[in-house]
């Protein structure tokens, strides 16, 4: 009950912001660009080891990411280019955050970790492949958004990792980003494999339906003349 009340309160705040931005004739594309700019700042903060502030900036950046689409729908300014811009800059936003983490763990400091650099790089490639698999699959099938580690889940994991990581602390609960990178590295490839399998299954199902339809049409076209011939033979005068 308490959680639902918080959710409703947050939604009312977001709805008010959307209405205000729509009435102010703020372009949804401007909101998209502001969001990606904040994500670039987040990547820089990660690179310098300012994890807590990177988490705060990431929250604000993804608030803009939520607002742009809603403002576009409310103001009637939904465009194909806007959708393309939003999707493209989302990929850039993901990558700059991963790169910031790779820079932090690759620097010649006491926090240097080759393993964490590898995990961040693997998670970066996996997240790109998840997005690419979805985009490519949807040119072949109606929808491909399966998998448990999509972009919203990655953002939440980044925020959890950022706000619960304090470089220099030996406490496991104050250094969660490495664990987050493990989850994202493994989860991204699992989601990629799931989307590959889903696309294969849907294409096979479509092929079976097409073959069944062709076979049905072929049978119907062949049975028609036979029935007409039988009717002619039956009614032919002796």
Predicted feature residues:
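Hydrophobic alpha-helical transmembrane segments
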Residues: 1-55, 62, 96-238
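Hydrophobic, well-structured mid-protein blocks that either form specific transmembrane helices
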Residues: 63-113
């Amino acid at each position: 009950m308490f959680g639902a009340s918080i959710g409703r309160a947050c939604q009312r705040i977001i709805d008010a912001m959307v209405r205000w931005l729509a009435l102010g004739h703020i372009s949804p594309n401007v909101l998209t660009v502001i969001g990606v700019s904040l994500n670039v700042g987040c990547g820089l903060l990660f690179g310098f080891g300012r994890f807590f502030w990177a988490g705060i900036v990431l929250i604000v950046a993804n608030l803009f990411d939520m607002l742009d689409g809603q403002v576009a729908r409310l103001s009637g300014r939904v465009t194909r280019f806007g959708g393309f811009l939003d999707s493209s800059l989302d990929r850039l936003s993901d990558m700059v955050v991963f790169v910031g983490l790779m820079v932090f763990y690759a620097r010649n400091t006491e926090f240097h970790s080759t393993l964490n650099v590898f995990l961040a790089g693997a998670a970066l490639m996996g997240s790109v492949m998840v997005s690419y698999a979805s985009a490519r699959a949807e040119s072949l099938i109606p929808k491909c958004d399966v998998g448990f580690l999509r972009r919203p889940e990655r953002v939440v994991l980044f925020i959890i990792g950022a706000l619960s990581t304090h470089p220099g602390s030996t406490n496991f609960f104050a250094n969660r980003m490495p664990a987050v990178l493990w989850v994202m590295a493994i989860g991204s490839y699992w989601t990629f494999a799931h989307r590959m399998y889903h696309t294969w299954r849907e294409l096979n199902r479509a092929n079976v339906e097409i073959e069944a339809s062709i076979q049905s049409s072929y049978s119907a076209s062949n049975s028609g003349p036979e029935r007409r011939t039988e009717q002619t033979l039956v009614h032919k005068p002796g």
